[in-house]
Regions:
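A Zn2+-metalloprotease active-site environment signal
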Residues: 19-273
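Sec-dependent bacterial lipoprotein signal peptides
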Residues: 1-19
Length: 273
């Protein structure tokens, strides 16, 4: 049984190592065992589960025509200049004071109304809202979720295989503990983007918003404002795994000349008859 278990893990890990693909944004080879269609299906399931969970908590879907139209227009403009313009992008607006936005694989995104307010919000104008949307679109096009799932697969396989082996040997307590560890790891570690993922989404998103005709200075304003607010608990959900706000503003400022050139080019093109 031990030999069989080791064989199972070895074969699975070998398959994982061989699942190299080309990153659609950087052009580099990366490990991702999922197809684009997997991303799309996973994203639909994630947004459906999120909507169901939110409704149980009393959070409704905001269907205000003006607000929804604004978001949809931003998504169309930004995704049109992205590396994956043909994905079935969709944005859902949740009516809640939570300060957050998120991206699921395959083009699904969620925005919480607590993020945007002209006076009190972290995001105060359309350019700043576009910066958030572009950041989330970048997570989608960089395929950060399924890359993270792939990176976490070796430990998942070890935990799962060890659980199967322990159960076969009659060690039920150990099997249950390992199975619980597998579920905790799968549910609590994998969905979070790494700081490297967040930094990449910042830089890619900055170029997306600029190419779409939104002022890239807005992205820097957001992180400077967040840094000034310090450890506001309302912001914790959005930034718990992100680089520090001041570091993000500094990194984006270095990219600003290139982004401004794209922004001016987009404005020139839009003004032509």
């Amino acid at each position: 049984m031990k030999a069989r278990w080791l064989g199972f893990v070895s074969i699975a890990l070998l398959a994982l190592v061989s699942c190299s693909t080309v990153d659609p944004v950087t052009g580099k080879r990366v490990q991702n065992m999922y197809l684009i269609q997997d991303d799309i299906q996973m994203g639909r399931e994630v947004i459906a589960d999120t909507v169901a969970t939110m409704r149980k908590e009393g959070v409704r879907i905001n269907k205000d025509a003006e607000q929804v139209a604004k978001l949809q227009t931003m998504v169309r403009r930004i995704t049109a200049v992205s590396h994956m313009p043909d994905l079935p992008y969709q944005v859902t607006l949740f009516e809640t004071n939570i300060v957050n936005a998120f991206a699921a694989p395959g083009g699904q995104m969620g925005v919480f109304t607590g993020l945007y307010h002209p006076e009190m919000g972290l995001v105060k104008d359309d350019d700043e809202l576009a910066a958030v949307i572009a950041h989330e679109v970048a997570h989608v096009t960089c395929r950060h979720t399924t890359e993270a799932l792939t990176r976490g697969m070796p430990l998942q396989l070890v935990l799962l295989g060890a659980s199967i082996y322990a159960e076969a040997k009659g060690k039920q307590d150990l099997a249950m503990g390992l199975a619980a560890g597998f579920l905790v790891y799968q549910g609590l570690v994998l969905p979070k983007f790494s700081r490297a993922d967040e930094s990449e989404a910042d830089s890619v998103g900055l170029m997306y918003m600029a190419k779409a005709g939104y002022d890239p200075n807005a992205a820097i304003r957001i992180w400077e404002r967040a840094a000034a607010r310090g450890k506001d608990p309302k912001l914790f959900a959005m930034f718990s795994s992100h680089p520090t706000d001041s570091a993000r503003a500094s990194a984006l400022r270095k990219l600003l000349p290139k982004a401004m050139a794209e922004y001016e080019r987009a404005r020139d093109n839009s003004s032509r008859p």
